[in-house]
């Protein structure tokens, strides 16, 4: 019933010209109301064809423009009517026009709306292309199906983008957490260095104090005894001077000689300006070295060993490990480091598979538990030719070798170019290594022509650095396990 009342009210406030709810309603003297735009257009048309005669479009009663009045009462009704919602039952009647109550059978192409036959004849849809819904449903079904497929593709792309950003987010989190772990570990190493230096310095000072105080205590005891001896002599002389003549002269010459010959012994002292003065560790140098290693590790490359046909070298299946097959080797001078390497040493040397022709490259080699090894970089060699060499003359920078090595478990050395007197034998320089490295880092800066070796076991301290290297051709990582059967292992960047 309420719906019927609403429909009746709608009819009363519907413009007779456009068949829409009144917009800015104006009422004529006859009582009929129209939209302001509709009555104005009608007025202009009347002026064109009827020579100034104006009449109501409904009842044809003439009117004067000055008699047209805004109808605020009707405007308020229209406004309230627009706010009113239909009942659920009425809302379910989707197949009928909400404005006219007629069945929805047509489709307006311009407005893309389903309309009734009265809507088609209204001012809103006049001149538009309209079709029966059955005529266009299949066409738009195909279009919507195509649009649906496009949306599904977009959905897949959106899901992939979502997955990519999540993966990148997770990757960044892992990377930064890894960097945080490295920072904590690096600074923990620095603290260990400082703690060790502090402990060593305090121990040295404590030992110095014990030694000095022990020596001074002995001197103090002797000085106390010497003072007591002088006091006793003084007491004896005072007693003689106060006694009888016989007591005065009895053994007087002996006493006088003892006093004249007596020499006071001076205590052993320590000059403060000659003692060892404590100096704080070179923290700047330590930090510079730490930064150098940190910078080098940014260029860590995953080195693997190149296949070879050398009979004395055994390369593991993963191409990261090399060991010596035959430990038997004879030295002409067993007590002299690296002075009589036989061709066996060359036959156990292997190259990394990656050539270095530019840029910066870093890798680490595990040499733990080995008593002998040689490592660094090499400008390449022919295996067969190398095995025919009976001496170690090729271990020189001028022949393309920038290497350091270990012999007899404790002797570390670096190979330099031979002197003018011995040009064919390398000049072997002993290296001072406080803590034996279980892991050695190698850093090559091709443009700077440098090769650096770091003791990773000892907080990355620099072992040795080749400068002004003449890289005239590609160089390769070089590993030589020598006579020791314990393998050398290339460490992965993630280790």
UniProtKB/Swiss-Prot annotation:
PTM annotation, UniProt: Degraded in a proteasome-independent fashion in the absence of viral infection but in a proteasome-dependent fashion following exposure to restriction sensitive virus.
Molecular function terms from GO: pattern recognition receptor activity; ubiquitin-protein transferase activity; zinc ion binding
Residues that coordinate or bind Zn(2+): 97, 100, 119, 125
Zinc finger (B box-type) boundaries: 92-133
Subcellular location: Cytoplasm; Nucleus
Any one Gene Ontology cellular component term annotated for this protein: P-body
Residue span, B30.2/SPRY domain: 283-495
Residue numbers carrying N-acetylalanine: 2
Pathway info: Protein modification; protein ubiquitination
Reactions listed under catalytic activity: S-ubiquitinyl-[E2 ubiquitin-conjugating enzyme]-L-cysteine + [acceptor protein]-L-lysine = [E2 ubiquitin-conjugating enzyme]-L-cysteine + N(6)-ubiquitinyl-[acceptor protein]-L-lysine
Coiled coil regions, renumbered to chain: 137-225
Region (Required for interaction with GABARAP and for autophagy), start-end ranges: 187-200
BP GO terms, sorted: activation of innate immune response; autophagy; defense response to virus; innate immune response; positive regulation of canonical NF-kappaB signal transduction; positive regulation of MAPK cascade; positive regulation of NF-kappaB transcription factor activity; protein K63-linked ubiquitination
Subunit structure: Can form homodimers and homotrimers. In addition to lower-order dimerization, also exhibits a higher-order multimerization and both low- and high-order multimerizations are essential for its restriction activity. Interacts with BTBD1 and BTBD2. Interacts with PSMC4, PSMC5, PSMD7 and HSPA8/HSC70. Interacts (via B30.2/SPRY domain) with HSPA1A/B. Interacts with PSMC2, MAP3K7/TAK1, TAB2 and TAB3. Interacts with SQSTM1. Interacts with TRIM6 and TRIM34. Interacts with ULK1 (phosphorylated form), GABARAP, GABARAPL1, GABARAPL2, MAP1LC3A, MAP1LC3C and BECN1.
PANTHER family: E3 UBIQUITIN-PROTEIN LIGASE TRIM
Known function: Capsid-specific restriction factor that prevents infection from non-host-adapted retroviruses. Blocks viral replication early in the life cycle, after viral entry but before reverse transcription. In addition to acting as a capsid-specific restriction factor, also acts as a pattern recognition receptor that activates innate immune signaling in response to the retroviral capsid lattice.
Domain notes: The B box-type zinc finger domain and the coiled-coil domain contribute to the higher and low order multimerization respectively which is essential for restriction activity. The coiled coil domain is important for higher order multimerization by promoting the initial dimerization. The B30.2/SPRY domain acts as a capsid recognition domain. Polymorphisms in this domain explain the observed species-specific differences among orthologs.
Family: Belongs to the TRIM/RBCC family.
Protein name as catalogued: Tripartite motif-containing protein 5
Originating species: Macaca fascicularis
Gene: TRIM5
């Amino acid at each position: 019933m309420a719906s019927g009342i609403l429909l009746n009210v709608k009819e009363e406030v519907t413009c007779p010209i456009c068949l829409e709810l009144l917009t800015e309603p104006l009422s004529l003297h006859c009582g009929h109301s129209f939209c302001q735009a509709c009555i104005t257009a009608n007025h202009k048309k009347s002026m064109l064809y009827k020579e100034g005669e104006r009449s109501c479009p409904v009842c044809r009663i003439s009117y004067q423009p000055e008699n047209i009045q805004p109808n605020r009462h009707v405007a308020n009704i229209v406004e309230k009517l627009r706010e009113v919602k239909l009942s659920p039952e009425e809302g379910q009647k989707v197949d009928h026009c909400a404005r006219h109550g007629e069945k929805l059978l047509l489709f307006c192409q311009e407005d893309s709306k389903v309309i009734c036959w009265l809507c088609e004849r209204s001012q809103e849809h006049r001149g538009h292309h309209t079709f029966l819904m059955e005529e266009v449903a299949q066409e738009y079904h195909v279009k919507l199906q195509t649009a649906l497929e496009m949306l599904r593709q977009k959905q897949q792309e959106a899901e992939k983008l979502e997955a990519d950003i999540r993966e990148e987010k997770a990757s960044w989190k892992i990377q930064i957490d890894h960097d945080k772990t490295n920072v904590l570990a690096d600074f923990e190493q620095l603290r260990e260095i400082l703690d060790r230096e502090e402990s060593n310095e305090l121990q040295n000072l404590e030992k110095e104090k014990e030694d000095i105080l022990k020596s001074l205590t002995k001197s103090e005891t002797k000085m106390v005894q010497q003072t007591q001896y002088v006091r006793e002599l003084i007491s004896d002389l005072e007693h003689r001077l106060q006694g009888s003549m016989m007591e005065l002269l009895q053994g007087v010459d002996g006493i006088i000689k003892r006093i004249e010959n007596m020499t006071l012994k001076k205590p052993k002292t320590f000059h403060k300006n000659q003692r060892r003065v404590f100096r704080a560790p070179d923290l700047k140098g330590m930090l510079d070295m730490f930064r150098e290693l940190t910078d080098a590790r940014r260029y860590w490359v995953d080195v693997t060993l190149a296949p070879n046909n050398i009979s004395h070298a055994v390369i593991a299946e993963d191409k990261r490990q090399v060991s010596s097959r035959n430990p038997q080797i004879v030295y002409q001078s067993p007590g002299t480091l690296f002075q009589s390497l036989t061709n066996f040493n060359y036959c156990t040397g292997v190259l990394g598979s990656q050539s270095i022709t530019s840029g910066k490259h870093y890798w680490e080699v595990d040499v733990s538990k080995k008593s002998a090894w040689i490592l660094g970089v090499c400008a390449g060699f022919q295996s067969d030719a190398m095995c025919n060499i009976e001496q170690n003359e090729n271990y020189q920078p001028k022949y393309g070798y920038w290497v350091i090595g270990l012999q007899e478990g404790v002797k570390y050395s670096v190979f330099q170019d031979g002197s003018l007197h011995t040009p064919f034998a390398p000049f072997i320089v002993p290296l001072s290594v406080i803590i034996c490295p279980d892991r050695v880092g190698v850093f090559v800066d091709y443009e700077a022509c440098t090769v650096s070796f770091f003791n990773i076991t000892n907080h990355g301290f620099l072992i040795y650095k080749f400068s002004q290297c003449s890289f005239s051709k590609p160089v390769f990582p070089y590993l030589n396990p020598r006579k020791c059967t314990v393998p050398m292992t290339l460490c992965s960047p993630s280790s």
